[in-house]
């Protein structure tokens, strides 16, 4: 019933991580109102996990899109970066709102779960790319950063001393709903020890209206090892 939850919350833009090609094809069939950008991280085609970025067809026109790898050679498909255990990448889209005519830049990523340098250097590269590609448009960045809010990685992303910094939507939202964590490993971690590692960041004038971590389960079943993060922006 995961597609029912997606329909219920009705997000205009949706960032997904760890999506395999067969799952992507299943989701395309079940979510016909969305188009998607992204490639498999292992070959830049359909091998390995996608950091797929979905957007509502009725709401947005796709102006441009692309992918890069979080590595010393970001344009080389399947490249591993620094001390990373896995190939890591980001997929992005420049979207035009059919209602307002405004343009938005959206990016979705998934940082390494092992490599400390890979996370730190990966977010530095990401900030550079967002600055380069967004063209001053309002920015929405979604992803599993495998790093807690107090970590050097997230502090680097949100460092106001860096003109390329992003703002954590949770920190500026007037409404914050749900737990202070997002990763529960299918309920195997005591809730008081669960970390917040999934984020929505904004930049360039976006106002955050509400933020929530959707931690409900389907009976005793978890839909994922992470709880979705939902943010409303204006």
Roles of regions detected by a PLM:
Residues 2-27, 54, 93, 103-109, ...:
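Active-site beta-strand/loop signature of hydrolases that rely on acidic residues for catalysis
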Residues 7-8, 29, 44-47, 83-87, ...:
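Extracellular/periplasmic catalytic domains that process cell-envelope and extracellular macromolecules
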Residues 13-103, 213:
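Structured beta-strand-rich core segments of catalytic domains in phosphoester-bond hydrolases
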Residues 32, 48-50, 87-91, 102, ...:
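Residues that flank catalytic or metal-binding motifs in active/ligand-binding sites
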Residues 41-45, 112-114, 146-147:
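Short histidine/acidic/glycine/proline-rich micro-motifs that form metal-
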Residues 66-74, 110-113, 173-174, 213-219:
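Short, solvent-exposed aromatic-acidic interface loops
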Residues 109-113, 117-122, 126:
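Hydrophobic, aromatic-enriched interface-forming segments
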Residues 117, 121, 130-139, 147-234:
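Metal-dependent phosphoester-hydrolase catalytic domains
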